[in-house]
Amino acid sequence: MEQVEILRKFIQRVQAMKSPDHNGEDNFARDFMRLRRLSTKYRTEKIYPTATGEKEENVKKNRYKDILPFDHSRVKLTLKTPSQDSDYINANFIKGVYGPKAYVATQGPLANTVIDFWRMIWEYNVVIIVMACREFEMGRKKCERYWPLYGEDPITFAPFKISCEDEQARTDYFIRTLLLEFQNESRRLYQFHYVNWPDHDVPSSFDSILDMISLMRKYQEHEDVPICIHCSAGCGRTGAICAIDYTWNLLKAGKIPEEFNVFNLIQEMRTQRHSAVQTKEQYELVHRAIAQLFEKQLQLYEIHGAQKIADGVNEINTENMVSSIEPEKQDSPPPKPPRTRSCLVEGDAKEEILQPPEPHPVPPILTPSPPSAFPTVTTVWQDNDRYHPKPVLHMVSSEQHSADLNRNYSKSTELPGKNESTIEQIDKKLERNLSFEIKKVPLQEGPKSFDGNTLLNRGHAIKIKSASPCIADKISKPQELSSDLNVGDTSQNSCVDCSVTQSNKVSVTPPEESQNSDTPPRPDRLPLDEKGHVTWSFHGPENAIPIPDLSEGNSSDINYQTRKTVSLTPSPTTQVETPDLVDHDNTSPLFRTPLSFTNPLHSDDSDSDERNSDGAVTQNKTNISTASATVSAATSTESISTRKVLPMSIARHNIAGTTHSGAEKDVDVSEDSPPPLPERTPESFVLASEHNTPVRSEWSELQSQERSEQKKSEGLITSENEKCDHPAGGIHYEMCIECPPTFSDKREQISENPTEATDIGFGNRCGKPKGPRDPPSEWT
């Protein structure tokens, strides 16, 4: 058990001891009675004999006839003087932390034992004398004055001469500097005289006692020579000071035993000096004083721990500067900061060291911005989240020219004036690149086995942020993919950002150009030549997919390997073919809605390998309808994927959708037959909030808002043959999911309608707020 836990347990035990039992006595009184019974047993049964103190020649040297030194631990005097040649003095050694003779517990000198007292001081090279009583207490002589007063002439106790060189008055005690001379040799020693400790009682405050003991240990830190402690009898107050100092030395050495308790300590002391800690009040004082020492030590531990953390941060900053000069490659980060991780961005090896978190929030969504205006995805999480490292961009070269992940960002941006207010809100949320891939995940997530050569092992999620009507401009025709393609191509699952331009179209660079062109430098702009159209581009150097126009009524299948697609289209029906990916874990990747952006670093369960090593694909077609509805954000804990992926939605909920069963049609694999229409529930129209309870009472309000929005929409309108019994006006995203063609009611999906602008941010939902309240900025 660590020292901190031991100290806390002792403090709690002392606090519990103050509570009285059924007899009205607290634990202090009960424990002290046990100590007294043990001492009586020692005396009556002669367990620790006191034969030397009982001798006739030594009886007169004892201040109290019942307080005699134990023979096995008594201090023996060997220094002879002409007047005194006996070896007896009423004193005992008490062992300390480092030796058996750390303390000399003795009675206050009598008039006939002062020379014996100085003999003992000289013989055992004592430097510190602690006196815990007054010379007179309650009209009785408690101790002979064995030192001269400050400013008076030296006192001679032949053959010893004692002078007082200095005296310092402190709270409740004095510090005197004494000069001891014997046979032309002099020694300087110090007397700590505590004057406010009543006999058989305790002082009102023990802070001055602790202060005196602390200062005493500054004068003598070691135990090479004993410290002489005495009061009147050399038992009660003497034993209390010894117990406190002994425990303090243990504490400073970090050697407090796991089962430390004061009872055992004083019981052992009583086997060395008779009646050490003489009263119940003194016994309680020792507990309280030690508990206070432990509390102060705990505070020191906390301060020391904070300093260690600060030093660690400084070391991280220093190593960050060094690593920027000398980059290294490390595939596995250490479990403690500083953690390093190598990444390949545009063919350059870079080492990145996680920095301590900054106070500003993580920007949620990417918007067009000039270079260096805001941090990109490679720096956002590095600067803002120390414990959840950023996603790493990788460029994996293939036989042909590598496709740049951000090749579609190289075009200039033009913003329409009518959407300036919306874009300002988007700009406030900073930027985050939508096209990225994760190759590495921090060790703290505990991911499963990764194959870093050819396989993309994370389920990718997307965010869309736009301010004008968006539709899918083109969807590629089916193109068979060879089973030996490089599945690890970095262009997989990359998506083209949705943005706003003057016209209602977005021109996407054809994927054929990405194959034939060299890898351009990473741009900072989005492709915004035309207005409103959204295209999810799944292109790569070897598996580029042509995108035909769906607005002309040509619905086609997307045949791809390890791809996840989202179609935004005005067509009545959109048929997307999703392959059944063959993998060992039988996991099903799915698309998250814009409100449920899946942070790969926040997934509770690690994603497994999504495909075979040979890249074999078993295809299965699934009809996906495009219905007109609002972006659903109903909270639900159900997930349709066999692979558990918990999205890190900013609303902190998963988005659940339901399908409409009333207008179902037979699912057909052909491209001409319309798919079944999804059924919407009131819960799916409620915005995700910090509460799990859906607001059903606002269903009618949402219906009226959506109908008014449908009338105002200028863009494309869904065909009349769409059987939708729910109001239109939202954007419904259909997720391509590895599953049988039929959709269950528990399947997550989001309806799409291109009649509204594709503004799916938290601040702007289809151009106007659709929720019961404005979402707070803390979501981002």
From Swiss-Prot:
Biased composition (Basic and acidic residues): 521-533, 602-613, 704-725, 771-780
Phosphothreonine modification, residue list: 509, 519, 569, 598, 693
Cytoplasm listed as a keyword: yes
Interaction with TGFB1I1: annotated span: 345-438
Protein localization: Cytoplasm; Cell junction, Focal adhesion; Cell projection, Podosome
Region (Disordered): 502-639, 657-725, 744-780
SMART domains the record matches: PTPc, PTPc_motif
E.C. numbers: 3.1.3.48
PANTHER family on file: TYROSINE PHOSPHATSE N18, PUTATIVE-RELATED, TYROSINE-PROTEIN PHOSPHATASE NON-RECEPTOR TYPE 12
Role: Dephosphorylates a range of proteins, and thereby regulates cellular signaling cascades. Dephosphorylates cellular tyrosine kinases, such as ERBB2 and PTK2B/PYK2, and thereby regulates signaling via ERBB2 and PTK2B/PYK2. Selectively dephosphorylates ERBB2 phosphorylated at 'Tyr-1112', 'Tyr-1196', and/or 'Tyr-1248'.
Family per similarity comment: Belongs to the protein-tyrosine phosphatase family. Non-receptor class 4 subfamily.
Protein name according to UniProt: Tyrosine-protein phosphatase non-receptor type 12
Organism of derivation: Homo sapiens
Protein encoded by which gene: PTPN12
